[in-house]
């Protein structure tokens, strides 16, 4: 898979909980804003540099907006960026292409570009 990342500046890896990467990295806990995640978040042992990234977000869903407000009020390390629910992501996965290449003007492609910018702008990842 390493041969397939030539030309990319950033790689996102989905690692199992508790598996520590051996290279410097940003730690993001990716969750849906739902009741299941809400219950589990308060039992999660947070690393000092870990941030919470909400995915499949829809600002029209009152429950999701309410949970975000609760998480902010509770002091959870919420990243000031959400990945909205966008059909372009599923279509890109089905086509086995990065969403930025498959649908570069989609909302989720712009949000992932913003996430990449945030990751790169933070400088060297602490480890």
Per-region residue spans from a language model:
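Conserved Switch II/interswitch segment of TRAFAC-class P-loop GTPases
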Residues: 22-45, 58-63
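Aromatic (Trp/Tyr) and acidic
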Residues: 107
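Switch II (G3) loop of P-loop NTPases
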Residues: 1-24
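Short, well-ordered alpha-helix to beta-strand connector turns
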Residues: 8, 24-26, 47-48, 75
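Conserved beta-strand segments of the P-loop GTPase G domain that flank and frequently precede/overlap
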Residues: 12-15, 28-33, 50-56
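Acidic-aromatic/histidine active-site loop/patch
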Residues: 48, 54, 125-127
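Beta-strand-loop-alpha "switch" segments that mediate conformational coupling across diverse proteins
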Residues: 56-60, 68-103, 112, 118
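C-terminal alpha-helix
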Residues: 114-126
């Amino acid at each position: 898979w390493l041969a397939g990342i030539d030309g990319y500046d950033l790689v996102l890896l989905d690692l199992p909980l508790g598996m520590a990467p051996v290279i410097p990295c940003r730690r993001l806990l990716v969750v849906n804003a739902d009741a299941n995640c809400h219950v589990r978040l308060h039992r999660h042992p947070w690393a000092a540099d870990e941030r919470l990234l909400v995915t499949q977000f829809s600002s029209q869903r009152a429950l999701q907006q309410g949970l975000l407000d609760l998480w902010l009020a509770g002091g959870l390390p919420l990243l000031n960026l959400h990945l909205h629910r966008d059909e372009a992501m599923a279509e890109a996965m089905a086509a086995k292409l990065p969403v930025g290449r498959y649908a570069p003007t989609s909302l989720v492609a712009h949000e992932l570009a913003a996430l990449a910018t945030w990751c790169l702008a933070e400088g060297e990842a602490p480890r």
